[in-house]
């Protein structure tokens, strides 16, 4: 069974309690269940992870590249959180391993503060989904499945 990696960056573990007017009231555990259900319906195994540390996210991306190249993974859904706007290292890791990535943001970052408009990840992502709340995650999982040719 092929997998789909779902990576969540800093502070996403606080979903449901952090700024519910911006990010909604769905908890991180509920988001994980939503992703696992969507992946399962597509015959994929969801590998769901979160870290507040840039280096850990980079390690997971580097590990996932060979899995995708070998056909054991359809790619990664990545919500880098605030690292979107600051992490060239995360961008470089994605580019280096040629991992298919769909960048996801729960809120519409284009409608928020100016500093959130810059993404270092978008240029190396296969696609970007923003502003659709938690629904962006299952859409990204489905997109990776379709783009992999597994559908």
Residue ranges, per PLM feature:
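Short beta-strand elements at the ligand-binding edges of bilobed clamshell
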Residues: 116-134
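Short beta->alpha junction loops
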Residues: 45-55
């Amino acid at each position: 069974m092929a997998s789909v990696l779902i990576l969540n960056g800093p502070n996403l573990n606080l979903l449901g309690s952090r700024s519910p007017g911006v990010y909604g009231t769905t908890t991180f555990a509920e988001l994980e269940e939503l992703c696992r259900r969507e992946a399962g319906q597509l015959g994929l195994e969801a590998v769901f992870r979160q870290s507040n540390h840039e280096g850990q996210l980079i390690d997971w991306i580097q590990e996932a590249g060979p899995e995708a190249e070998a056909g054991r993974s359809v790619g990664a859904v990545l919500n880098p959180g605030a690292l979107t706007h600051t992490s060239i290292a995360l961008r470089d890791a994605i580019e280096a391993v040629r991992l298919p990535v769909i960048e996801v943001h729960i809120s519409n970052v284009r409608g928020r503060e100016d500093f959130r408009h810059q993404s270092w990840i978008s240029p190396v992502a296969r696609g970007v989904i923003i502003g659709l709340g938690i629904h962006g995650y299952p859409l990204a999982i489905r997109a990776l499945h379709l783009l992999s040719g597994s559908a």
